[in-house]
Amino acid sequence: MVSRVLAQRVSQTLGQPVTVENRPGSGGIIGSAEVARSPADGYTLLVNSTVLAVDKWFYPNVAYDARKAFAPVALLATIPSVLVVPADSPYKDARSLLAYAKANPGKVSFASAGMGTSIHLAAALLAAQAGVDLLHVPYKGSTPAAADLIAGRVSMMVDSITAQQSFIKSGRVRALGVTSLQPAPSLPGIPPLAQAADLPKFEVLTWFGLFVPSRTSPDIVKVLNTAMNEALKTPEVQKALADIGASAQGGTSQALGVLWDNEIDRWGQLIVHHRLNTNEL
């Protein structure tokens, strides 16, 4: 969705059409591998997220080393996630949910869109910081995961605001807290988990960045970075992103590279320490 919001505006800036092609499968690995093999001419771009920082742990046979295969161009947007439970859940707040989980190890389950997805990692970090043992139930995508959450087959889910916003507003799920340090404008009245769960350091933002094959010339990277930053500054793009719960970002290619390195280190430590790639928490 972030790609589609930007495509039309960037097309105007560059003076040529920008086409968005979704390449699902294996957490985005299939699409990423295709871009990695593409000519480094600035015409085949990759929009990817947190998964680009963790794919090597969950997909050991992946055909590329992401940090060597791609060059960062610009940070596009960030989206907080939200902790949700079924509408008829007995838990009215994050503290009571985590208190029950601590007293009953393995009895509270959480749904994810699959191993290594941002949904999986956000819940795993919450469990690690809260010192609780949660049962991970991975699904093949967020849609079936959300369906089972609504039906009460799993206890909780830490999903993107974009995906859960309509369910929250329709009363099909109950929101207990957002993963940003500040309240999310799109979900007024829902507290940050840093406060609601007494975890002052807890923050998870799913980020979306633009990347190109690493062989791409710095001049092309600069042109693309300028186009993205111009688009991200426009009121219409900022509003369109805000409507899906996202915040426009921007900045230098170097800044995205630093974020990427920090995310590789942050999530790598969590994955290895808690053996998340073996589905154990």
Swiss-Prot record:
<dbReference type="InterPro" id="IPR005064">
    <property type="entry name" value="BUG"/>
</dbReference>
<comment type="similarity">
    <text>Belongs to the UPF0065 (bug) family.</text>
</comment>
<dbReference type="InterPro" id="IPR042100">
    <property type="entry name" value="Bug_dom1"/>
</dbReference>
<protein>
    <recommendedName>
        <fullName>UPF0065 protein in clcB-clcD intergenic region</fullName>
    </recommendedName>
</protein>
<dbReference type="Pfam" id="PF03401">
    <property type="entry name" value="TctC"/>
</dbReference>
